[in-house]
């Protein structure tokens, strides 16, 4: 236990919180251009072909972003919006592509959880 005098001379150091999404620079979303669109495999015990893309952001960062939902229209040079949120079984993927924003279309024929996939309300 430090004495009062020791604390007066050298106060306790504050713990600095490290961001899980440094490329966003404290913004909710960032715009970027796809440099590569590809599939990758998750780590054990899962098995799939996960759709991801490499994105060069407006602030110069180059990050990997996950493309959620069934089917997408992204290719190289597509302009997309990314948000934070990692994919637990894909190492190094710490961002998600926002569906239905900029060049990324919403998920076709989506009926439930539509707001997460950029889909308008269907006509009754």
Curated annotation (Swiss-Prot):
It comes from the Bacteria. The modification 3-methylthioaspartic acid is found at residue 89. Pfam families: Ribosom_S12_S23. CDD domains: Ribosomal_S12. InterPro entries: NA-bd_OB-fold, Ribosomal_uS12, Ribosomal_uS12_bac. One of its GO terms (cellular component) is small ribosomal subunit. One of its GO terms (molecular function) is tRNA binding. GO terms for biological process: translation. Keywords: Methylation, Ribonucleoprotein, Ribosomal protein, RNA-binding, rRNA-binding, tRNA-binding. Belongs to the universal ribosomal protein uS12 family. HAMAP family: Ribosomal_uS12_B. With S4 and S5 plays an important role in translational accuracy. Interacts with and stabilizes bases of the 16S rRNA that are involved in tRNA selection in the A site and with the mRNA backbone. Located at the interface of the 30S and 50S subunits, it traverses the body of the 30S subunit contacting proteins on the other side and probably holding the rRNA structure together. The combined cluster of proteins S8, S12 and S17 appears to hold together the shoulder and platform of the 30S subunit. Part of the 30S ribosomal subunit. Contacts proteins S8 and S17. May interact with IF1 in the 30S initiation complex. This is Small ribosomal subunit protein uS12. It comes from Klebsiella pneumoniae subsp. pneumoniae (strain ATCC 700721 / MGH 78578). The lineage of its organism: Bacteria, Pseudomonadati, Pseudomonadota, Gammaproteobacteria, Enterobacterales. The gene is rpsL.
């Amino acid at each position: 236990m430090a004495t009062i005098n020791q604390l007066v001379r050298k106060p306790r150091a504050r713990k600095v919180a490290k961001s899980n999404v440094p490329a966003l620079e404290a913004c909710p979303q960032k715009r970027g251009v796809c440099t590569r669109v590809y599939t990758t495999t998750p780590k054990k015990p899962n098995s799939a072909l996960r759709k991801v893309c490499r994105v060069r952001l407006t602030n110069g960062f180059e990050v990997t972003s996950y493309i959620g939902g069934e089917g997408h229209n992204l290719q190289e040079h597509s302009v997309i919006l990314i948000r934070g949120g990692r994919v637990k079984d894909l190492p190094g993927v710490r961002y998600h592509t926002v569906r239905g924003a900029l060049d990324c279309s919403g998920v076709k024929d989506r009926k439930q959880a539509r707001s997460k996939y950029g889909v308008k309300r269907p006509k009754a």
